[in-house]
Structures are given as structure tokens and as C-alpha cells.
Amino acid sequence: MTKYALVGDVGGTNARLALCDIASGEISQAKTYSGLDYPSLEAVIRVYLEEHKVEVKDGCIAIACPITGDWVAMTNHTWAFSIAEMKKNLGFSYLEIINDFTAVSMAIPMLKKEHLIQFGGAEPVEGKPIAVYGAGTGLGVAHLVHVDKRWVSLPGEGGHVDFAPNSEEEGIILEILRAEIGHVSAERVLSGPGLVNLYRAIVKADNRLPENLKPKDITERALADSCTDCRRALSLFCVIMGRFGGNLALNLGTFGGVFIAGGIVPRFLEFFKASGFRAAFEDKGRFKEYVHDIPVYLIVHDNPGLLGSGAHLRQTLGHIL
């Protein structure tokens, strides 16, 4: 008889839940719920389990916020809870809450070639560290290393490191954003809101008044080539994505590859392919040759958060991935 575990991927807007076959890692019965419709994560889980009429005693949920102890208060949502209390209330034997990019990183060993698009570099070196980052509502970052037949995710808040400009234009943008918001982290330019910040700064640098645009508006106008400012903002976004990814590669010598997740880049894939992303990734001065062969991949799997939550749980329960 198949034994299932509960897996989840919870963001500021939606909660995605699914079942994971503990033996094979296969994800099934995925369903998305609006977080606004439920008073708590526990309530969503109860509805899901009731709908699917399956006995589950183990679970792993990925959430888009730092996980530093038993109490979890979501960054972009009102939900807050004790992990131990929720485990007890649900009658689970094991329940773990992990950072969303811990989950994405743990999905990487489970991905197939059709789930990846490569942007330059050579083949990944087996056993070497891996980096993963992705722009969405924010900028998530994690690393992954392989130690004693186990994958170990190294989560953190790398999206909040300082934005490091490396051109005159980027320096001007930093000054404009610093005057507006104070500290300028990488996330302030590499995210949905970050794309808006880039657009606004480009326009203001020319002493003009920016329109009140959303990320979707900027992307659409850039792809239609109907707005020079929007096209410049999207081009610069791709370049800064490259610089940031190259920095991650240098930090840990990620010859196992650098992986891009998140919902933004797939929306303008052809534009991204033709952009200055890879040149910026390799623009490391004396260490250009060091990063030259490091491959970069875009993850195009539908649910890497669910896949990675399942992989993390299965490994915790003793399975070798």
C-alpha cells in the first residue's frame, strides 16, 4: 500500500498542497488555495486532507519567510503559528516547516533535463556546490552541497545583501533609490517590485516623471518595444540578475551549477536569452575564467517547491535521493 506524506508550498497569496509518495517521491493531487479565504495554514491543511480522504502522518511545508524556531510568522501574510502545536493538532508524527528556497534547492537533485534550460557554461561537476536564486515577490537564495550521500541545503537571506552596482548607470540608479528608500538591497532591484524600482529610477535619472506602472505593465511594454524606459529596465534587470548569479558562483565555487527559479524570468524567456545576462554573469575581472564554465539553468518545473519539500522530507525519513 502506498504511503503518502503531505507537502506544501506557501507564499504570500496562495497555499499549494499535495501528496508525496514517500517511496518514489512522486507528487500528486496538487491543489492551490487562496490564503485570503482561510484563517490559518492549519485550516487549509484540514480542508485539503478532508477533500482527499487520505491518512497522512508526516508533512513538510515550504514557506516564503525565514524559519528560525518553533514560531513562524509569515512575512507577506497574517498567518502565524507554532510548528509543535500545529503538529499536535493535526495528529502528525512528523511535521517540518522549511524556507521556500530550501525546498527549491532540494528539488534540484530530483529535476530531469526537460525541467531545465541552460544559459552558457559547460557541464556541471558532480559533487560540487550548487547555488539557486529566484526573483518573484522578493529575491530568494540558497545553496546546496552533497555530503556523505546526503544533500544539505544552506538557506539564508542572500536576497537582502547590498545591491552592488558595477557601471555608471547602475551607480546612478543606486543613488536615486537610496534617496527614496534608504538601504538598497539586491531584492530592491531583482524582484517584481524591483523591476518597478528600476523603471522609476531610469525615468527619474532623466528628470522626468515615471508612470504608475506594475511589473506586468513594464514587461509587456518592453516586449512590445513600445516604451524605451521599460525595455531599458527589463534589460538592466537581466544584467543585474547575471551579476548577482556570478557573485553566488564565486561565493561557494558552485561548479555544480547556478539555478534560477521564480516566476518572473519565464515570462520573458526569449528576451532573457538575448540579453546581457550571461556576459554579466562572467564579468568578474580577473576571475572571468573561473566562472566561465559554470553552467546556469532556468528551472521550468511547475512545482519545484512541492517537489523539494517532498525530497527534503524523504531524506529526513531515511531515503537516499
Swiss-Prot record:
It is found in: Cytoplasm. InterPro entries: ATPase_NBD, Bacterial_glucokinase, Glucokinase. Gene3D superfamilies: 3.30.420.40, 3.40.367.20. Its EC number is 2.7.1.2. ATP binds at residues 8-13. GO terms for cellular component: cytosol. It catalyses: D-glucose + ATP = D-glucose 6-phosphate + ADP + H(+). It comes from the Bacteria. Transmembrane segments: none annotated. It is an enzyme of class 2 (transferase). One of its GO terms (molecular function) is ATP binding. Keywords: ATP-binding, Cytoplasm, Glycolysis, Kinase, Nucleotide-binding, Transferase. One of its GO terms (biological process) is glycolytic process. Its main location: cytoplasm. HAMAP family: Glucokinase. Belongs to the bacterial glucokinase family. This is Glucokinase. The gene is glk.
